[in-house]
Amino acid sequence: MKIMMVTSELVPFAKVGGLADAVTALSIALAEKRHDVRVVMPRYYKIDRKNLKQIPGAMAVHLGPYEHWVGVYESNLPSSKVKVYFIDHEQAFGRDGVYGSAFEPDFSDNTKRFSLLAHAAFQVCRKQAWIPDVVHAHDWAAGLVPVLLRFTEKNTEFKNTASVFTIHNMGYQGVYSKHTFPDTGLDWNDFYTTGFEDWDRINFLKAALVSSDMLTTVSPSYAEEIKRPEFGFRMDGILRYREKELTGILNGVDTSIWNPSKDEYIPYRYNSKTLEEKEKNKSVLQERFGLEIDISVPVFGMISRLVDQKGISELFGPMYGSAFKICSDIKLQMVVLGSGESWCEKELNFLSQRLPNFRCYIGYNEELSHLIEAGSDFFLMPSRYEPCGLNQMYSLLYGTLPIVRKTGGLADTVENYNEETGEGTGFVLDYLSPQSIYDTVGWAAYAWYNKKDHIKKMRTKAMSKKFGWNIAAEKYLKVYADAIEKKASML
């Protein structure tokens, strides 16, 4: 099968969130099953042309009355046969930032930028004389792709090509002024028919939900949640209408990177039978953060974007957040790695100065993120909503028991602790509040000090979990086949 991925993020070239990891890992998993997978993405400012191969001849892309000339570069995903085509346009992509910058969080010309990507994706296929069986578009930034396939390319060489659209996070929809609609390259007559119209604005995600042959999202529970107003972000009606075409497929984990027995970032590698090595990583983590080195005290780790979705108000809010009370009342240590909202960064620094058992690192550090997973005993992830989540799966594989809210992919991957039997793989909050976080952390700490056999049993079970991409790839192939069948029935 010939599969074209269109994405705004791709590891190792550009990453803002888990989207980048997911598209890379899925593409490689499909290629390993002998499918011809190619990825189209922008060549951002930080992607050096010197490391890419230029494809001769510029391409003309028409957006409204304007003609844009774009270049194309080529490379491969590391250690794979997956080709990556980079759309090169200095005005659109020759700047720092994927969607925005520190000075402009959401670029004002994003409609034009990502419309250019969508149109260019089809032009690249023509240029390479390669017509895919399926176009798989990821998140709002690629939302125009299924629209073009349905309305603009329906009588071209792409007439038999099916579309699949994956929702990685309903909270990000690509909503812009109606006056930018001509930048999509569509006619004003298409404003309503394409699904772009959203309360007198344009909405890339909505257009994709309306136009795609099949829809997926990144966990079974999230597929159910987004059909409800609480999690649907105003799109729940469309998703209920299209529920037969919507499939939830749990993301996998790249176990070549996240594997405690092979992890190159941690000082002591281990497995479920050598957990004493995990304790050595704990001592290194404590020393690294300037905490008292004491393996008898449980360490609670957290790696997160510091945004409202992640439950930061309930955990770190200066007025009612539970972190200060947790660290004051319970014998434990807490380490946090992340960046995001300025008030939260300031609060974390304040807690680090005020509390001897709390430390933070503002920013991101790959080596430190692996050490936190390996050296912590518990992992905090009290998300308000979580489409899939990766860190709870990393934590399970590392024997670091997650503390999560029952939502989305967290509900699909973490089994709540049973005090009587010792079964489970983590600790689950039924609802999100400062008190529920406090109670659940206290529950975990109680088990640590009083139920050592249960902790060991849970760790062993957690580390036996399988989160490879092979299962997810098979499920996506089924969705692709359904999309092709649906497209054929409409011809």
Curated annotation (Swiss-Prot):
CDD domains: GT5_Glycogen_synthase_DULL1-like
EC number: 2.4.1.21
GO biological process: glycogen biosynthetic process
Reaction(s) catalysed (UniProt annotation): [(1->4)-alpha-D-glucosyl](n) + ADP-alpha-D-glucose = [(1->4)-alpha-D-glucosyl](n+1) + ADP + H(+)
Pathway named in the protein's UniProt entry: Glycan biosynthesis; glycogen biosynthesis
PANTHER family per record: ALPHA AMYLASE DOMAIN-CONTAINING PROTEIN, GRANULE-BOUND STARCH SYNTHASE 1, CHLOROPLASTIC/AMYLOPLASTIC
General function of this protein: Synthesizes alpha-1,4-glucan chains using ADP-glucose.
Organism per entry: Treponema denticola (strain ATCC 35405 / DSM 14222 / CIP 103919 / JCM 8153 / KCTC 15104)
Record-stated family: Belongs to the glycosyltransferase 1 family. Bacterial/plant glycogen synthase subfamily.
Keyword field: Glycogen biosynthesis, Glycosyltransferase, Transferase
Residues where ADP-alpha-D-glucose binds: 15
One Pfam family named in its UniProt record: Glyco_transf_5
InterPro entries xref list: Glyco_trans_1, GS/SS, Starch_synth_cat_dom
UniProt-listed HAMAP family: Glycogen_synth
A GO molecular-function annotation: alpha-1,4-glucan glucosyltransferase (UDP-glucose donor) activity
Name of the protein: Glycogen synthase
